[in-house]
Regions:
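A short, conserved alpha-helix in the catalytic core of glycosyltransferases
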Residues: 110, 168-176, 180-185, 191-207
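A recurrent flexible, glycine/aromatic-enriched loop bordering the glycosyltransferase active site
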Residues: 78, 153-178
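Short beta-strand-to-loop element that shapes/binds the nucleotide-sugar donor at the catalytic cleft/hinge
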Residues: 120-140
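Short aromatic/hydrophobic "clamp" motif used to bind/position activated sugar donors
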Residues: 93
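Acidic donor-binding segment of Leloir-type glycosyltransferases
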Residues: 25-69
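Conserved donor-nucleotide/metal-binding helix-loop-beta segment in metal-dependent transferases, i.e.
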Residues: 105-121
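Short, well-formed alpha-helical segments that are part of the catalytic scaffolds
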Residues: 14-29
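Glycine-rich, basic loop-to-helix element that forms the pyrophosphate-binding segment
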Residues: 67-88
Length: 207
């Protein structure tokens, strides 16, 4: 396995969240010895304010404009993720959300379990505003970029971290090989239904 990976986040309309994920991606938390780690932000039908801010930041970015701008938003989101994966110039990809703050060694711990077969995902700690999904933890360190208590987060994440794996769970951050992502047919567009019931809620929790 070639030791290169690109961490990719989407951004839509929030300059605050853009600044948050920019600071996280540019931090030492997204560096790992022995790996070539790239970072990129994909502007997903982004607002002029977001695009102007991106131009000011020292980070690679690409602009995606959906061919069906009036389509259901989840369909557009997953088309953008597919675009992000297909256009990556790296052999391995890690998708993250723009509202995420990373813990120490999060990336190296994910890569320990990246075997080219399974898709490892990080355990999420969420604020508790909405019910968390499988293996998720509810603990409030702030519910917006301006409210985040980084010191509290660092202490709490260090306290609960474990080097173990479980089946299922939430869907990002996740690591996979680009070639396998393409060979799989990419993400389906929008929600997946079973017996008429959506399996993916709008906030991204697999039931």
């Amino acid at each position: 396995m070639k030791k290169n990976i690109e961490i990719v986040s989407l951004i839509f309309k929030s300059v605050d969240y853009l600044n948050l994920i920019y600071n996280e991606l540019k931090s030492d938390k997204c560096k790992i010895e022995g790996w070539d780690v790239g970072v990129r932000i994909v502007a997903n039908d982004a607002t002029p304010e977001v695009l102007n801010r991106l131009k000011e930041l020292d980070i690679p970015y690409t602009i995606y404009n959906d061919p069906k701008p009036n389509d259901y938003y989840l369909n557009r989101v997953y088309r953008c993720w597919n675009h992000a994966g297909v256009t990556s110039e790296y052999n391995n990809i890690c998708f993250v959300n723009s509202d995420m703050v990373f813990s120490k060694d999060w990336l190296s711990n994910l890569l320990k379990h990246h075997d080219g077969i399974n898709i490892p995902t990080s355990r999420l700690v969420e604020s508790g505003k909405m019910r968390s999904g499988t293996h998720g933890v509810s603990f409030n360190c702030g519910r917006s970029p301006k409210q985040i208590d980084f010191e509290l987060w660092e202490k709490y994440s260090e306290h609960i971290k474990k080097n173990e794996t479980h089946s299922n769970g939430l869907y990002m951050p996740c690591v996979f090989e680009k070639s396998r992502f393409i060979d799989s047919g990419l993400y389906p567009e929008g929600n997946i239904y079973k017996d008429g019931i959506g399996t993916l809620h709008p906030h991204g929790v697999i039931q």
